[in-house]
């Protein structure tokens, strides 16, 4: 088929994007709900180069390729999406809000951007209602040590799920330490110009405010075990 005929079917730039060796794995990651930030240099540069054409490509599946103000990319499904999806749990989203709060904190710079799972858990208990958190784990929770242990395990699971979405990077093979990416702004408060974003995020957490429906994070329906384990740093 001549190049002229190809252009009648699809733009040459889109054909180049689909033929690029980066595309298959990147496409799979985006469809799984992963956010692609500046840390993923090659993938991010690829999306920057072909954004206009890939937006048209994904529109055929009734999803939008979004570039957030912070620079990261993700797919936002419409109600008629052809890509399977599921919504994050309430605890997953609460952990995401805490991560966003930590991202905005002075401690991020002091710690070179590295936090521990224990720091995440402690901040969660400081800012959120512990009784409500325990109810997310066990609706009949009495506040026992067993329930608290289960909550901590669930928080670890939520953190790992958010890692698979590109929200955090584990430090090498040490899953107890992680670095937060700008993608956590998916969980950020919508603040007016002049507001303190960290204080707005604190209110969002304490008030238990739900995220707007259009900002709900979507996952595909595959199990975590089937997801690529790519969220690590050396």
UniProtKB/Swiss-Prot annotation:
Acidic residues composition-biased segments: 221-234
Major localization listed first in the record, in broad terms: cytoplasm
UniProt cross-references to InterPro entries, sorted A to Z: MukE_C, MukE_N, Scp_MukE
GO cellular component: condensin complex; cytoplasm; nucleoid
Coiled-coil ranges (or none): none
Keywords: Cell cycle, Cell division, Chromosome partition, Cytoplasm, DNA condensation
Source species, domain of life: Bacteria
Region feature Disordered, mapped onto this chain: 207-234
Subcellular location: Cytoplasm, Nucleoid
Keyword Cell division in record: yes
Biological process, per Gene Ontology: cell division; chromosome condensation; chromosome segregation; DNA replication
Quaternary data: Forms a hexameric complex with MukF, (MukF-(MukE)2)2, which forms a ternary complex with MukB. The complex formation is stimulated by calcium or magnesium.
Family: Belongs to the MukE family.
Physiological role: Involved in chromosome condensation, segregation and cell cycle progression. May participate in facilitating chromosome segregation by condensation DNA from both sides of a centrally located replisome during cell division. Probably acts via its interaction with MukB and MukF.
Protein name in UniProt: Chromosome partition protein MukE
The species this protein was found in: Escherichia coli (strain K12)
Gene name tied to this protein: mukE
